[in-house]
UniProtKB/Swiss-Prot annotation:
Residues 1-22, 36-48 have a biased composition (Low complexity). One of its GO terms (biological process) is negative regulation of transcription by RNA polymerase II. Residues 1-115 are annotated as: Disordered. This is Polycomb group RING finger protein 6. Residues 23-35 have a biased composition (Pro residues). One of its GO terms (molecular function) is zinc ion binding. SUPFAM superfamilies: RING/U-box (SSF57850), Ubiquitin-like (SSF54236). Residues 72-110 form a coiled coil. One of its GO terms (cellular component) is PcG protein complex. There is a cross-link at residues 223, 234 (Glycyl lysine isopeptide (Lys-Gly) (interchain with G-Cter in SUMO2)). InterPro entries: PcG_RING_finger, PCGF6_RAWUL, RAWUL, Ubiquitin-like_domsf, Znf_RING, Znf_RING/FYVE/PHD, Znf_RING_CS. The keyword Nucleus applies.
Length: 350
């Protein structure tokens, strides 16, 4: 047939001879290693999976097994670290809440914020100013002094000066004492300490002003009082306790106010209940007139004339000057006698 190659036996043998001469001999094949059979009760090695070859989707080769174990332990440690961090955060939050509740307060440090605690409220000094001002001088309290009858507080110098011509509280108008209002006032050192802490440099400025005041006048600067040790009660005489304030020598003028009558048209008025009054010698006739107008409820158109002996007194004259000028003729049992009368004001007549 055409197109079919005819191979003879001789050609086949020649080809084999040529191929055997051209190809190298194959390497020797080592016999397979024999695995000893497991003894009774022992398990043999696990058979390898057919799909365990490298590059397959089966199990990893033996050399990658330590990495898989290390990754498992690393993941377990990371989970434990996260749990510890969460527990620490919860403990910190609880501690912060406890600190917030324990430190809940109002700081009065001149408006300065020491921490960022939201529950602490800062108060401006202007909100506290009405409580640390003296209503007489309109300044900050210096030597804060409180009236025991009404608990209103003023500067010591202001309230002592006020009591020279009045026995009433300048704030509520209550009678502090009929004759000696200085008996019913006390120093308030706690309030004064608060004022010094609230107002920066107030204490230093006050000390400097006091030092300059005494130095300009050539006087010795008074030293702060130092508490003395209490001596033993045995063998010591009893001492009379002195008042916190000494009664000024000016408060030694006792008055006897005598009513001599009123003209027609003076209007209605109340009689004076108490005609014995003790005031400062520096008080003027104008102060006495104001006292009479307030006590008697006089009409503004009513004029008050005050007479001592045969002298019609002027409003600017002080009681000490009147006593010195008139002498013993103005005195009766140690009292300065003043006569007063009510007349119609000349402005009303015209």
């Amino acid at each position: 047939m055409e197109g079919v190659a005819v191979v003879t036996a001789g050609s086949v043998g020649a080809a084999k001879t040529e191929g055997a001469a051209a190809l190298p001999p194959p390497p020797p094949v080592s016999p397979p290693a024999l695995t000893p059979a497991p003894a009774a009760g022992e398990e043999g090695p696990a058979p390898l999976s057919e799909t365990g070859a490298p590059g397959c989707s089966g199990s990893r080769p033996p050399e990658l097994e330590p990495e898989r174990s290390l990754g498992r332990f690393r993941g377990r440690f990371e989970d434990e670290d996260e749990e510890l961090e969460e527990e620490e955060e919860l403990e910190e939050e609880e501690e912060e809440e406890e600190e917030d509740m324990s430190h809940f307060s109002l700081r009065l440090e001149g408006g300065r914020q020491d921490s960022e605690d939201e529950e602490e409220r800062l108060i401006n000094l202007s909100e506290l100013t009405p409580y640390i001002l003296c209503s007489i001088c309109k300044g900050y309290l210096i030597d804060a002094t409180t009236i025991t009858e009404c608990l209103h507080t003023f500067c010591k110098s202001c309230i002592v000066r006020h009591f020279y011509y009045s026995n009433r509280c300048p704030k509520c108008n209550i009678v502090v004492h009929q004759t000696q209002p200085l008996y019913n006032i006390r120093l308030d050192r706690q309030l004064q300490d608060i004022v010094y802490k609230l107002v920066i440099n107030l204490e230093e400025r006050e000390k400097k002003q006091m030092h300059d005041f005494y130095k300009e006048r050539g006087l010795e600067v008074p030293k702060p009082a130092v508490p003395q040790p209490v001596p033993s009660s045995k063998g010591r005489s009893k001492k009379v306790l002195e008042s916190v304030f000494r009664i000024p020598p000016e408060l030694d003028m006792s008055l006897l106010l005598e009513f001599i009558g009123a003209n027609e048209g003076t209007g209605h008025f109340k009689p004076l209940e108490k005609k014995f009054v003790r005031v400062s010698g520096e008080a003027t006739i104008g102060h006495v007139e104001k006292f009479l107008r307030r006590k008697m409820g006089l009409d503004p158109a009513c004029q008050v004339d005050i007479i001592c002996g045969d002298h019609l007194l002027e409003q600017y004259q002080t009681l000490r000057e009147i006593r010195r000028a008139i002498g013993d003729a103005a005195m009766q049992d140690g009292l300065l006698v003043l006569h007063y009368g009510l007349v119609v004001s000349p402005l009303k007549i015209t």
